[in-house]
């Protein structure tokens, strides 16, 4: 983009006002375009407009937490603005805000950016606030106090500055007066008035102040100039005596800042003494106008109020105070079209206020001269990610102040009210101190001043940053997250995800498996029967006990089936389900015997079906286990297998003894021994099931019971049972009851 050799375009037939840059296009760029011979420097206006666009892009990136991108946009915008332009302060302040969000925080860079912002625009509120925080963070409390004093001098109700001031008072000790030293931003005003700067090196001799110079009262605040229509930033002037010296501490404490009314050119304000101040003319008193609010939070409707032209940050605080339980919310208003519009900035909040005022003007029989319309706001709960990110302060050139009603009063009334306000403030401070000293919790937190001073001196001398470990922790977590992000997106991570998924699947199935085991154990409860009672009572008790145990077995079956639905190859669940079917069949047979009814008329189909189901599940579980065991053995034999370590750890947990030290690796021989033990348990359980079935079939006179008995004996032998134990079991079979009573030991007849 090149310039045309300094050639200027002239505006034919238009006045100077039409040739100036529109303020809405530059969003508060205070300097108009340079006018040369009735023309406008369009190149400068284009640069300023482009700088504003870059600032908006930087704000969007800041809201998206892309702080590096926002820094670049602000830097590019600074390059387009002349060095003497006051709007450079906004860009430098925004860069400082980005630097304070980037971990670890480079406080020296933050201080440098804020200092450049104050160089372009002295007294810039946001730059002073951020520089004060940076000074506080690096332990330069004296410099932080100076910036806080300027903030509190221009706005005594500044919330953030008040909080920092309290912390600095604690850090500097109870005897440190925050008002004792001027701030760097006030150096220019003090030097211009000839006042020496105390506490900042050697004092220069004061210069005489001309009578035609500025003779504002103590702490006066300049108001908007009505002649040019531009709003100038309020500038706080340090108290000055008639001799040019600064007002003493005791005198300055009795002064309350009051805005001066627009006086004609001939009027002057003079100081009549060092201890009292007289004001010539009339003084305007500030009274904040409040706008009524109606909050709609689900079914909860509450009333509230906010200052007219309130900032969005203050509105968020009001909502939080009215609804303490709310966390992340959206604040919406209804526009003129009846749509709910979300408020995300102060500019949009002003639109909402305008919409409320428009509704007020449409209402008849309403005094519209001094009325403020009620604003209806809808508060909606959202997730923290959806809540609009609240900037530390909205980046606009001129900070909007609440609308102030002007009440004309006499000078004597103003001064008397000043004294009353000061006395009330002193009394309130004394009451707060008294109440805080009476609090027992506060007493417990008190510490000796010398200890705190020594710690502060030690930290300042050594240069220890108390928050360094927090910054390092956050930096480490960020690096860990970046490394993890690169790892999880690689191809090598997918097998690990599959393995983790299988582990969680097994854990979930194991939970249902254990849940079912609880019901199986509960079913073993011994329920006493009153044999002395009548037959009907005993029968009822028996029926109740049968139903209760049956219900426990049914619940166990449901849990085992859920475990198998989660992990179909969960052989433990299949074995447990077979055990449940076997116990259910035994329950049917035991209930039949307890009733002492004729067996010949009983239908055994349901009981035999349960035995068949148990045997089928036992067979399927055995085959499933054999396949898994074969695969595990292959993994152990293969030295290059990735699963060798995993299988070894699992075997170590299963076969470890608390008194003996288990080796770190399990050999193939040890794994084979453990597999043999598991196989023996399966055979033993299978043999018991076949033995019980043979007894039921023998009792009901069904053919084939001896075949099941022989199969049971074979299973016992495969399980490794001794011959004596097997002979004892066969002897107790129901088919040998007659032989057992006679005392003769007979073999089981062959089928």
UniProtKB/Swiss-Prot annotation:
Its main location: cytoplasm. Residues 290-382 form the PB1 domain. Induction: Up-regulated by heat. TPR repeats lie at residues 51-84, 89-124, 125-158, 434-468, 481-514, 536-570. The keyword Repeat applies. GO terms for molecular function: mRNA binding. Residues 1-11 have a biased composition (Basic residues). Residues 390-399 have a biased composition (Acidic residues). Keywords: Cytoplasm, Repeat, TPR repeat. Pfam families: PB1 (PF00564). Residues 421-443, 630-648 have a biased composition (Basic and acidic residues). Residues 12-28 have a biased composition (Low complexity). One of its GO terms (cellular component) is cytoplasm. Disruption phenotype: Normal constriction of plastids during division, but impaired separation, resulting in plastid clustering. The clumped-chloroplasts mutant phenotype is transient. In juvenile leaves, clustered chloroplasts are observed in almost all cells of the petiole, while in the oldest leaf, the phenotype is mostly absent. Phox1, phox2, phox3 and phox4 quadruple mutants show a 70% reduction in root hair growth. Expressed in roots, stems, leaves, apex, flowers and seeds. Detected throughout the petiole in juvenile and young leaves, but restricted to the petiole midvein in older leaves. Expressed in hydathodes, at the base of the trichome, in the vascular cylinder of primary root and lateral root, in emerging lateral root primordia, in pollen and in developing embryos, but not in mature embryos. Residues 409-419 have a biased composition (Polar residues). It is found in: Cytoplasm. Residues 1-33, 386-443, 630-663 are annotated as: Disordered. PANTHER family: PROTEIN CLMP1 (PTHR46183:SF8). Required for plastid separation and partitioning during cell division. Not involved in plastid constriction or in the organization of cytoplasmic actin cables. Contributes to polar growth of root hairs. Interacts with myosin XI-K. This is Protein CLMP1. It comes from Arabidopsis thaliana (Mouse-ear cress). The lineage of its organism: Eukaryota, Viridiplantae, Streptophyta, Embryophyta, Tracheophyta.
